[in-house]
């Protein structure tokens, strides 16, 4: 195999597929990036058996073939080469010569035939969403997935499609994030759980442009994201997602409308002297139209405590200038939501002692 391409194109491609290279594996071939130039395009692929990414880069094929190269070594070499044309040539025993101007690197590769290809997925009836919308939905929900594997379902997000509405849900046992968007077309009801790791990596690759679309394809075991010159294939998390409907309520005793930025600044100041790792709650005292800053409130006075990080995480991803907070009592969850409920954040309170 012999190909040539610009450094900028190769760096971009390697950066995209490297997100699917495992950090630990007992299979050395999975630590590689496959360069496939067996057809008329140059395709880079990485696959950790749970997440696979494939992207096409611009370039010229002088001699068709394929080679698998160690991802870390290959990435380091490519990034440090001059900003010019790079030539990659593989020969006997998979020895590979990488040349750019006066720089030359000779590294050992592996047979492309041994590489674990992405599973074949029939791409029919795609769900189309703008890259901007999907990137935003992930940003506004991903922070409340669980960060450990004690409950696998909590490490993913529910994609609940019904008609022309897509609802994305995440939870970690202390909070729930829900984001609803309207789709351009109507689809059959479908519920799947997508790994949080997959969504984080997809979000990094998405351009975020409103006029560029990403197409989603679903099977019983996989989800496919197809956009630009890239395809991401991920295994789904098995199992039935949590029934959150019984935790959601429109009843409230106290409603507060507040400037989001002012509340964030207030929480930031209140936690200024709290050491990182200390589990001290922030106490919210709502009384006589006051919450230590100007608010509009309806209903009963209230004294309630929350983990400040959970409040900050939710408020930071809300784009509206003002936020509505709904409370029932000091033992019930707080809801942050807009009137149309395009977003809903549920946060459980924490116990505290002492007068405020």
Where are each of the predicted segments found?
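Structural preference for solvent-exposed beta-strand-turn elements
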Residues: 1-356
């Amino acid at each position: 195999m012999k190909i040539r391409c610009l450094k900028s194109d190769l760096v971009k491609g390697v950066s995209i597929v490297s997100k699917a290279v495992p950090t630990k594996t007992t299979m050395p071939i999975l630590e590689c990036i496959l360069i496939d130039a067996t057809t008329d395009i140059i395709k880079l692929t990485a696959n950790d058996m749970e997440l696979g990414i494939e992207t096409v880069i611009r370039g010229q094929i002088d001699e068709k073939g394929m080679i698998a190269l160690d991802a870390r070594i290959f990435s380091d070499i490519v990034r440090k080469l001059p900003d010019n044309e790079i030539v990659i040539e593989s020969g006997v025993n998979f020895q590979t010569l990488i040349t750019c101007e006066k720089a030359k690197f000779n590294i050992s590769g592996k047979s492309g035939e041994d590489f674990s290809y992405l599973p074949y997925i029939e791409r029919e009836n795609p769900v189309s969403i703008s890259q901007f919308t999907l990137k935003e939905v992930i940003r506004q929900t991903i922070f409340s997935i669980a960060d450990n594997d004690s409950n696998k379902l909590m490490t993913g997000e529910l994609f609940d499609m019904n008609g022309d509405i897509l609802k994305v849900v995440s939870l970690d046992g202390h909070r729930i994030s829900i984001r609803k968007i309207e789709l351009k077309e109507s689809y059959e009801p479908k519920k799947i759980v997508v790994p949080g790791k997959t969504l984080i990596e997809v979000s990094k690759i998405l351009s975020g442009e409103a006029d560029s679309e990403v197409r989603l394809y679903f099977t019983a075991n996989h989800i496919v994201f197809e956009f630009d010159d890239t395809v991401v294939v991920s295994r789904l998390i098995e199992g039935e997602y949590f029934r959150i409907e019984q935790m959601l309520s429109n009843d409230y005793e106290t409603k507060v409308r507040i400037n989001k930025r002012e509340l964030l600044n207030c929480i930031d100041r209140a936690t200024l002297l709290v050491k990182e790792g200390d589990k001290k709650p922030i106490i919210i005292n709502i009384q006589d139209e006051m919450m230590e800053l100007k608010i509009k409130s309806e209903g009963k006075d209230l004294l309630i405590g929350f983990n400040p990080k959970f409040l900050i995480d939710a408020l930071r991803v809300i784009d509206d200038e003002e936020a509505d907070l709904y409370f029932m009592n000091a033992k019930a969850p707080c809801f942050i939501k807009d009137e149309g409920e395009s977003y809903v954040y549920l946060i459980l309170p924490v116990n505290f002692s002492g007068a405020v």
